[in-house]
Amino acid sequence: NVIYNAKPSGPVINIDDYVTFEALEDGFTVRLSRNATEYCIDGDGDWKTLSSGATSPSINNGQTISLRGNCTITSSTSSTGGIGTFTLGKKCNVRGNAMALLYGDSGKDNISLSGKNYAFNRLFYNATNLQNVSENFLPATTLSQYCYNYMFYGCTGLISAPALPATTLQQYCYQYMFRGCSSLTTAPVLPATSLQRYCYQYMFQNCSKLNYIKAMFTTT
């Protein structure tokens, strides 16, 4: 017998093109404080709307939930600017591409945050359930002012951080980015050779397990 319209087994999308949370405990949920997004579970491609400030359906250990959106950056202050802040209900890892929150399906083709001041400000602020972030999560090579400000501030459970490939920096772009990440053992390499005012200010403050930070800039 031929079965028609059968649901395909396994993922039908590349979950690394989106912001994808991997649950490490049963009952994981995610909430973004501002901006509506779309989500799908286990890469099934069945995208559903998640309203601004709403909590996602729960998933269990080993499952994934992927997000995409065309999020609007609100305000222009370090306390309220950005697309919002995630609340993570249980322990998780995050992988994929943060640009999918700004550009949806086109995020994988975009490596510039030019003009996107405060874009990811406070995105994972005090997200103590966050454990690991994939290396390619922040692919932008051109940054904007305050774009990663406070991004992982207070993520005390964060063990591994994403690479930071940007070579074109702006003022305050990394300010407080990993402040208080007391479980972080290895800092991402900082490849930019030309800096901007306060670009690294307090970036790794109170990261008590770091032994060194490799930065490529030169002084004159």
Where are these regions (language model features)?
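Negatively charged
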Residues: 2-220
